Regions:
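Short alpha-helical transmembrane segments in multi-pass integral membrane proteins
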Residues: 1-24, 78-145, 189-246, 302-369, ...
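N-terminal transmembrane alpha-helices
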Residues: 8-40, 44-45, 61-73, 105-109, ...
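Transmembrane helical elements of multi-pass membrane transporters/channels
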Residues: 19-35, 141, 175, 204-208, ...
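Helix-terminus/linker motif at the lipid-water interface of multi-pass membrane proteins
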Residues: 29-51, 120-129, 185-192, 253-286, ...
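Small-residue hotspots at the loop-to-helix junctions and early N-terminal turns
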Residues: 47-58, 135, 139, 198, ...
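Small-residue-rich hydrophobic transmembrane alpha-helices
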Residues: 50-110, 149-168, 274-340, 373-395
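Hydrophobic transmembrane alpha-helices of multi-pass small-molecule transporters
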Residues: 62-65, 179-183, 209-213, 286-289, ...
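Short runs within selected transmembrane alpha-helices of multi-pass transporters and secretion channels
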Residues: 71, 141-160, 168-176, 197-212, ...
Length: 452
């Protein structure tokens, strides 16, 4: 790949960017809806059920983030090969990310299915018997869905690498329709409670997986896998994918392990605190959907620019994407402050104590997100698109453990503070991440990395 920066015509016009990012916003909203729908509809069973589902979902996020990190590695490599006009290598990288994803997700599903009780006890310690019963039920079926989530994430990432985000959006739409419809039938119709929610999620993820794989095999797909023999390991491509995927996986994994460590603190504060934390977490995820979507799309835009050797365009698009992320974040979080928070919380069957806790958390979240969220989470994806994953990993891991986990344990165990201070630790982590990522971006060293 050439290192020269050129000033040729723009690689992406306005219509192409809109066509990429609008479906991504919809896809992210739909993706988050699965966890939110489960929590919302399970709330009719009671706070113990909500708490059980939320504890498992915190672990599920860890697994999904690890799988997504590997998909990110594949997307970055494929994007840069597309930008560099090497279609055969791009297709080969698609086959290798599928090989990696299938292997890892199947092994993970088996381990978690067999050891789910020990995992829950090890992470969350002593929790109410009802909460544990619900959690074990939800955990088993969640684990069975990991291979389908993994393959779906890989397929969706490959479509986005081509600049086609409509496929993953439509697949996510189908997944959510099946999930919500299944929840309604199994929870309300058959009274299956948590088991019904978990079953609906499993079936919906299976359908999304098969849909993406079918579309990936169409003749007009630039990254299709033509033969099963294409899945034969290619050590050179695996190394290139893992160069981005492993640091991203360690970053996401350690980030989620840190969150799990903090969740174990939350579980000591009582069922109301667990429920408030779960509901506020789900709602807050929705508020950052636009900025999150921009970060995902940045892997395609910045990756293709750098693959084509267009460093000037890469930096220009990066600034535009970051400003877009801030605009979306301000729109959503100001709406939350003025009316969305109370409206969303009213949908959940929370006790007055849990409702009050959740509302307080949301107000703080809105205020801090306006300043810190895009620079903490959208900006590092821009750096990863250039292959600068080792830097983002180092900053994220150190910041998580030093500023979030240590702070939370100190405030809760030493000073006996409540749930709000656990979220304060999260905000402190964001501030540190933002500082280092912004400095890295301004100095431009992130564009000196070599992926292909």
């Amino acid at each position: 790949m050439t290192d020269a920066s050129t000033t040729s015509r723009p690689l992406f016009n306005r219509q192409q960017l809109i066509s990429l990012f609008l479906p991504l916003v919809a896809e992210q909203a739909l993706s988050i809806s699965i966890g939110l729908a489960d929590t919302l509809m399970v709330s009719s069973v009671g706070e113990a059920a909500v708490s059980g589902v939320s504890l498992v979902d915190s672990f599920n996020v860890l697994m999904i983030q690890l799988l997504s990190a590997l998909a990110t590695g594949g997307a970055v490599v494929a994007s840069q090969y597309i930008g560099h006009r090497e279609p055969k290598r791009a297709k080969a990288s698609a086959a290798q990310i599928m090989f990696i994803m299938i292997s890892l997700s199947v092994v993970t599903a088996v381990i978690v299915s067999v050891g789910r009780h020990a995992i829950l006890r090890g992470i969350f310690g002593s929790i109410d018997a009802d909460v544990m019963r619900y959690a074990e039920t939800y955990f088993l079926l969640s684990a069975l869905s990991y291979p389908f989530i993994g393959v779906y994430n890989a397929g969706a990432a490959l479509f986005r690498a081509q600049g086609n985000s409509k496929i993953s959006m439509l697949s996510s739409l189908v997944m959510n329709v099946v999930n919500i419809g299944g929840n309604a039938i199994l929870i309300y119709g058959f009274g299956m409670g948590v088991m019904g929610a978990a079953t609906a999620s499993l079936v919906s993820r299976m359908i999304a997986c098969f849909t993406v794989m079918f579309l990936l095999q169409k003749p007009d797909c630039a990254l299709r896998i033509d033969h099963l023999t294409d899945l034969k390991p290619d050590l050179d491509l695996i190394k290139r994918i893992l160069k981005v995927g492993i640091p991203a996986g360690i970053e996401n994994g350690m980030f989620q392990i840190g969150k799990l460590s903090v969740s174990s603190l939350t579980s000591t504060l009582g069922t109301a605190a667990i429920a408030a934390n779960a509901v506020a977490g789900n709602i807050s995820s929705f508020l950052n959907v636009p900025a999150s979507a921009v970060g995902i799309g940045a892997l395609t835009v910045v990756g293709q620019c750098l693959g084509a050797g267009e460093k000037v365009q890469a930096k220009r698009y990066s600034r535009l994407l970051l400003l877009t992320a801030y605009a979306g974040d301000w729109l959503m979080n100001l709406s939350g402050l003025f009316f969305l928070n109370k409206l969303a919380l009213s949908w959940f069957n929370l006790s007055p104590e849990a409702y009050g806790m959740a509302l307080e958390l949301m107000v703080w979240f809105n205020a801090v997100s306006l300043i810190l969220w895009p620079s903490s989470f959208t900006l590092p994806n821009i750096l990863r698109a250039a292959g600068d994953a080792a830097f983002t990993m180092t900053v994220s891991v150190i910041s998580m453990w030093v500023f979030r986990v240590a702070f939370c344990y100190l405030m809760v165990l030493k000073f006996h503070c409540g749930l709000l201070f656990i979220w304060m630790g999260m905000f402190l982590d964001w501030a540190m991440r933002s500082l280092f990522f912004c400095v890295r971006f301004v100095r431009g060293r992130w564009m000196e990395q070599k992926v292909i």
